[in-house]
Amino acid sequence: MFEARLVQGSILKKVLEALKDLITEACWDVSSSGISLQSMDSSHVSLVQLTLRSDGFDSYRCDRNLAMGVNLSSMSKILKCAGNEDIITLRAEDNADALALVFETLNQEKVSDYEMKLMDLDVEQLGIPEQEYSCVVKMPSGEFARICRDLSQIGDAVMISCAKDGVKFSASGELGTGNIKLSQTSNVDKEDEAVTIEMNEPVQLIFALNYLNFFTKATPLSKTVTLSMSADIPLVVEYKIADMGHVKYYLAPKIDEESS
């Protein structure tokens, strides 16, 4: 059987919030090393990859590998029934057609027990190659979310230009243009608030803002976000989940200015 217990259950609630608007259903691959998920969004433009390592759970048992087909909006609805302070346990038998979700208050005075039907999904696993990136920008996740939100008022695509000294986000539309430049921070006491840039060569790429705004739904999971870019390959937007894993979003650049 499979059983995973997470005292800080709010992490799981945040993970579902980060996924459910982008993908409707996905296969949760459960093994002794943890839980992983990989899925294209419904329009096959972006890819999301989630890893939750078993050692990040407070207790974890998986006797044999499972592939659980999950409707993410259903799971999100059930997780909304859990309080932010609740302990969450996920449980499934080896050949289960349902996933049990148990929510306990810290004082054990209230225990809620839900069962969610699983789906049969045919899933193709895409190999994601390990890449060296021309530019890797690490910045506060709230700042990135705000930039994407602000520039969405101007246009539907953002040009990200990365150089040694800073990164620039630009959008243009019928009402005009907007540019936001972040300089690399020279000395910051708090790592969470720093903007750091590792650059091998400058990069200038255009991305659809509506997808980036979907990705920023993961902001509550991490105080920082990492953007990895190279010409002609997908951007990677990564949110680390403390002591547990990460959620990574992949988005191919738009080909040229005229078509956007």
UniProtKB/Swiss-Prot annotation:
GO terms for molecular function: DNA binding; DNA polymerase processivity factor activity. Residues 61-80 bind DNA. It is found in: Nucleus. GO terms for biological process: leading strand elongation; mismatch repair; regulation of DNA replication; response to activity; response to bacterium; translesion synthesis. Transmembrane segments: none annotated. The modification Phosphoserine is found at S259, S260. Its main location: nucleus. Monoubiquitinated by the ube2b-rad18 complex on Lys-164. Monoubiquitination at Lys-164 also takes place in undamaged proliferating cells, and is mediated by the dcx(dtl) complex, leading to enhance PCNA-dependent translesion DNA synthesis. The keyword Nucleotidyltransferase does not apply. Keywords: DNA replication, DNA-binding, Isopeptide bond, Nucleus, Phosphoprotein, Ubl conjugation. Gene3D superfamilies: DNA Polymerase III, subunit A, domain 2. GO terms for cellular component: nucleus; PCNA complex; PCNA-p21 complex. It holds the Pfam family PCNA_N. InterPro entries: DNA_clamp_sf (IPR046938), Pr_cel_nuc_antig (IPR000730), Pr_cel_nuc_antig_C (IPR022649), Pr_cel_nuc_antig_CS (IPR022659), Pr_cel_nuc_antig_N (IPR022648). There is a cross-link at K164 (Glycyl lysine isopeptide (Lys-Gly) (interchain with G-Cter in ubiquitin)). This protein is an auxiliary protein of DNA polymerase delta and is involved in the control of eukaryotic DNA replication by increasing the polymerase's processibility during elongation of the leading strand. PANTHER family: PROLIFERATING CELL NUCLEAR ANTIGEN. Belongs to the PCNA family. Homotrimer. Forms a complex with activator 1 heteropentamer in the presence of ATP. Component of the replisome complex. This is Proliferating cell nuclear antigen.
